[in-house]
């Protein structure tokens, strides 16, 4: 993202920066986020817990963090630090190689234990949360690592896969996963396309941010318009154009 685009994205969500005086209207999505942690805290508040019966940990996306922390290098370094400190877990969501979900570790632990309570996999899951989760912040795990370093037997690994804690990456390798996250991913992909379609169908393929957020969300947008707009800006699927009447979202030239 070039400098101009980064600055416009930060303005769209109220990240503090110096600006020339002028009658620029405040944007409806304001935040005080100045760090990756603050951005995640803001974003998880937008996550519709009730939609998933509070069975999932609140999930933010790396792309959304970029909408609030304009310098991607800084954002990535801060996310890596939070990951190394064990405060967050980063999850490969699967619909895109760059689609990374972010959850607070304690939220992840709580929801996973709840999802596996009373099931045959509970023992393997508890062992994983106690031994692997605190020691390794990686997105994926290898066969030798699981069996030799952490002492898991093949049947236990199978139980972790069945529980949704791991998903197969390739032979002898697994991604860390969130049990039941498939429902979220389905909602997210449909919602992203629906919000993009709203901008695409607008005159000149551009739409005022305030107007977009003021509209009634289509049925496909179950995660909320604000949740998706953060993603669209951070993923560079729309450009932010400041005007005297507020930020304009515009589809990039192709």
Swiss-Prot record:
Main subcellular location: nucleus
An MF annotation (GO) of this entry: protein homodimerization activity
UniProt-annotated stretches for the region Winged helix domain 3: 180-254
Region (Winged helix domain 2): 120-179
InterPro entries reported in the protein's UniProt record: STK19-like
Gene Ontology CC terms, in alphabetical order: nuclear speck; nucleus; transcription elongation factor complex
Sequence motif Bipartite nuclear localization signal, location on chain: 4-21
Alphabetical list of Pfam families matching this protein: Stk19
Family per record: Belongs to the STK19 family.
Subunit description: Monomer in solution. Homodimer; when bound to DNA. Component of a transcription-coupled nucleotide excision repair (TC-NER) complex composed of STK19, ERCC6, ERCC8, DDA1, DDB1, ELOF1 and UVSSA which assembles and interacts with the multiprotein RNA polymerase II complex when it stalls at DNA lesions.
The protein's name: Winged helix repair factor 1
Taxonomic lineage of the native organism: Eukaryota, Metazoa, Chordata, Craniata, Vertebrata
